[in-house]
């Protein structure tokens, strides 16, 4: 009984120990979790050994639990020490010193430029020395150029222009640059337009001549039987076969071209004056090319006359006059070209295609009659141009002592020497 009781006590004691061991095991689990938290490896003994020696287990548990605490303290101390070291390193690094303020680079000045404009701070010159005529920089006499913002030697600087010579040379080169091709093209175009306008006005003025009435009234009237300069006397006779003149409304006018040195000045006599007989070009310029270009260059087709051509010829012949001295109206002059005459023959209205200028060789301007001291007159210029369509014909010349007659029936002129 005693042994049993003793065994029970021992068992109780063992249970107590086991309880304590179980309690220690519960603490070990907590410590194991804590050890796992800090990364420590935990080795488990055999179950028998753990059951046989709870104290040993508890001792081992305490021993295993001790290192994590120490390690945790060491880790905590290490973190704390590291923090302290880091703080000491930041406090030890001093901030960089501020840059020195910009100062004037002129010797003897050294003015602080931190409170003025950025232009002077960038070029390191004060306001006073930027305009000074002479300063010393780097041991040399120079002057600050505000055009290029640099210091130049005195020979390189123009005191009058207040600029360096290199800058002035570039400025003058830009000013003397030649004009662009576009501007020169516009200038030539404007000049050509002006020339064209002047040429057009010139053409209009000479294409439509206008003779004032005062000049027309000032022309001397030539009466039948009057003697004009050069000794040419005009006679007006009515021929039996004469056609009525559409110009002045009178009968046909005749003139004689016979004369000699003994009988006096030559007097023209001949057949009837054709209806178109008039003096063209009176009061015109001495150059007969204008009158010829207006009268003879344009061919007139009598079968296909237009009103416009008649109007142009009437305007061109507005300054003509008949042989008897009366001014001729343009409409009557245009009608006279349409009238038949012995000069044109029967082909005047039927031939068609021959110009009136070729059919009227008698038309002579006053400018073509050249009086001389020997009282002779000759036809030139217009007579040759009028006959050039039918072939070359020599210009008739009437000299003193020679006569010429015109045969109306055969339409031929005989010249006697």
From Swiss-Prot:
UniProt PTM comment: Phosphorylated at Ser-163 in response to infection by the fungal pathogen Magnaporthe oryzae. Ubiquitinated by IPI1, which leads to proteasomal degradation.
Protein name in UniProt: Squamosa promoter-binding-like protein 14
Any one GO BP annotation for this protein: regulation of secondary shoot formation
Note on domains (UniProt): The SBP-type zinc finger is required for the binding to DNA.
Reported function: Transcriptional activator that binds to the SBP-box DNA core binding motif 5'-GTAC-3'. Can target the TCP motif 5'-TGGGCC/T-3' through interaction with PCF1 and PCF2. Key regulator of the plant architecture that controls shoot branching and panicle development. Promotes panicle branching. Promotes high grain yield. Binds to the promoters of TB1 and DEP1. Suppresses rice tillering mainly through positive regulation of TB1. Regulates plant height and panicle length through positive regulation of DEP1. Repressed by D53 in strigolactone (SL) signaling.
Positions carrying Phosphoserine: 163
Molecular function, one GO term: sequence-specific DNA binding
Record keywords, A-Z: DNA-binding, Metal-binding, Nucleus, Phosphoprotein, Transcription, Transcription regulation, Ubl conjugation, Zinc, Zinc-finger
Key word Nucleus present: yes
Record's compositionally biased regions (Low complexity): 61-74
Organism, scientific name: Oryza sativa subsp. japonica
Zinc finger (SBP-type): 101-178
Gene: SPL14
Tissue distribution: Expressed in young panicles. Expressed in the shoot apex at both the vegetative and reproductive stages. Highly expressed in the promordia of primary and secondary branches. Highly expressed in young panicles.
Residues annotated as binding Zn(2+) 2: 145, 148, 152, 164
Record text on subunit structure and interactions: Interacts with PCF1 and PCF2. Interacts with IPI1. Interacts with D53. Interacts with SLR1. Interacts (via C-terminus) with SHI1.
UniProt biased composition (Gly residues): 1-26, 51-60, 75-84
Subcellular location: Nucleus
Chain location of the short sequence motif Bipartite nuclear localization signal per the record: 161-177
A Pfam family that the UniProt record links to this protein: SBP
